[in-house]
């Protein structure tokens, strides 16, 4: 997945009309409000005129996922958590359409929130992305609040740093304790997959961890923008699978299957048959399917 090529001057920001970015108050007042979606309808929003030449959109070979031209009324609050330096803010910047440059004027110190409306499986959804996990000092209490306010979570680690992978496992346990009675969508994200020679955590380890902790798994590269689009599409699907009616999810699944190749359908069918009679194969099948973000 790549963003459309856009010529940008140093210190400029490319933004879609349906994405917004604002700075969060340092005292965390925004976290004390109720979580109803309508609370976002009165926020100040950045606007973009047709003359803006620094627009960006996610490139896709299909019509499954494009930036919506109209605001949807479905909001998903997604929280990025993980160790420092694993690429959370870079993922957030790509999501927001911000040109990632250390000299960019759009760099904001402190807690950030991004909003973007996507079209996923023919339906619009607005993601409110919170990237404030690394704020420490007097705001350490924000960690506890982050564990409570999300509709979904992206636990990010670097495949080049085993310590960050182990920390991700700890965060999954903490999140389970904080939200014991809730079925919260969680995706374990192995970032920096482009750094093959520096890899310390294998794909199989990431999958096994996701199976053990009952979450989804994907590897991304924020540097080359690989699988970032799929990541945010996937978290929308995971929330929908838990929240919406069975009939509505079945229609979405049918929508996806129409675009699925015959060989993949065959592998899925035979895999289910074999797994019924073999527990070890069932575990392997679950391990392989944990990266399928379109199913529970």
From Swiss-Prot:
Its main location: membrane. Keywords: Calmodulin-binding, Cell membrane, GTP-binding, Membrane, Nucleotide-binding, Phosphoprotein. It is found in: Cell membrane. Residues 57-68 have a biased composition (Low complexity). The keyword Cytoplasm does not apply. Most abundant in thymus, spleen, kidney, lung, and testis. Less abundant in heart, brain, liver and skeletal muscle. GO terms for biological process: cell surface receptor signaling pathway; chromosome organization; immune response; metaphase chromosome alignment; mitotic cell cycle; signal transduction. Residues 266-285 are annotated as: Calmodulin-binding. GO terms for cellular component: cytoplasmic side of plasma membrane; midbody; mitotic spindle; nucleus; plasma membrane; spindle midzone. Phosphorylated on tyrosine residues. Induction: By mitogens. GTP binds at residues 82-89, 191-194. GO terms for molecular function: calcium channel regulator activity; calmodulin binding; GDP binding; GTP binding; GTPase activity; magnesium ion binding. InterPro entries: P-loop_NTPase, RGK, RGK_GTP-binding_reg, Small_GTP-bd, Small_GTPase. The keyword Membrane applies. Belongs to the small GTPase superfamily. RGK family. This is GTP-binding protein GEM. It comes from Homo sapiens (Human).
């Amino acid at each position: 997945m790549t963003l459309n090529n856009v010529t940008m001057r140093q210190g400029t920001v490319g933004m879609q009309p349906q994405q917004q970015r604002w700075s969060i108050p340092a005292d965390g007042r925004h976290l004390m409000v109720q979580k109803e979606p309508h609370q976002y309808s009165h926020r100040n929003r950045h606007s973009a005129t047709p003359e803006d030449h620094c627009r960006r959109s996610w490139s896709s070979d299909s019509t499954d996922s494009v930036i919506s031209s109209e605001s949807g009324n479905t909001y998903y609050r997604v929280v990025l958590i993980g160790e420092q330096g694993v690429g959370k803010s870079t993922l957030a910047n790509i999501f927001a359409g911000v040109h990632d440059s250390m000299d960019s004027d759009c760099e904001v110190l402190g807690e950030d929130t991004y909003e973007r409306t996507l079209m996923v499986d023919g339906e619009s959804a607005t993601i409110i992305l919170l990237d404030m996990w690394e704020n420490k000092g007097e705001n350490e209490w924000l960690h506890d609040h982050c564990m409570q306010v999300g509709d979904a979570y992206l636990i990010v680690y670097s495949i080049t740093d085993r310590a960050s992978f182990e920390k991700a496992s700890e965060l999954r346990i903490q999140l389970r304790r904080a939200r014991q009675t809730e079925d919260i969508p969680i995706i374990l994200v192995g970032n920096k997959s482009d750094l093959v020679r520096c890899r310390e955590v294998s794909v199989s380890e990431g999958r096994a961890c996701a199976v053990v902790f009952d979450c989804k798994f994907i590897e991304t590269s924020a540097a080359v923008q690989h699988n970032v689009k799929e990541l945010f599409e996937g978290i929308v699907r995971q929330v929908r699978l838990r929240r919406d009616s069975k009939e509505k999810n079945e229609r979405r699944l049918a929508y996806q299957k129409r675009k699925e190749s015959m060989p993949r359908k065959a592998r899925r069918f035979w895999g289910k048959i074999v797994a019924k009679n073999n527990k070890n194969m069932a575990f392997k099948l679950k391990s392989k399917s944990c990266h399928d973000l379109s199913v529970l």
